[in-house]
Design a protein with these regions (language model features):
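Basic, Lys/Arg-enriched alpha-helical interface segments
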Residues: 1-70, 79-83, 89-122
Length: 122
């Protein structure tokens, strides 16, 4: 199985919502998030619970829990070999609809212009 390319979503202003969220996390949570992203690279569409789950409208979540806090990384697939990370959040019970809606909007913008909305580190 070939690896899935994982890209990060970039806003119009050049900012990356995932990086902004990730940089504020404790080191242990960052490590677990990184491991989930690696599993996404390895497994792609085949990644399932408890590591990932489908939410709705083409949006999936990577699931990370540590110390009773449930962190989620929302992502979507673009083509057969790319997963695009929209953003991350901490949640209590279910992922709020507004967060899924935000990911859906980012998915639409990305699909309209992938090059413009792919984050590249400087």
């Amino acid at each position: 199985m070939s690896k899935t390319r994982v890209a990060l979503y970039r806003e119009e202003d050049g900012s990356c919502p995932f990086i902004e969220w990730f940089d504020k996390l404790p080191a242990k949570v960052q490590d677990k998030c990184y491991l989930r992203l690696e599993r996404l690279r390895e497994m792609g569409h085949e990644l399932r619970r408890p590591e990932a789950d489908f939410l709705r409208d083409g949006i999936y979540e990577l699931r990370v829990s540590l110390g009773g806090v449930h962190h989620r990384i929302l992502y979507f697939f673009h083509g057969a070999v790319a997963a695009v990370v929209s953003h991350g959040l901490a949640k209590e019970r279910v992922v709020p609809s507004k967060e899924i809606d935000r990911a859906v909007e980012r998915k639409k913008r990305f699909e309209a212009n992938p090059a413009k909305h792919t984050y590249e580190e400087a």
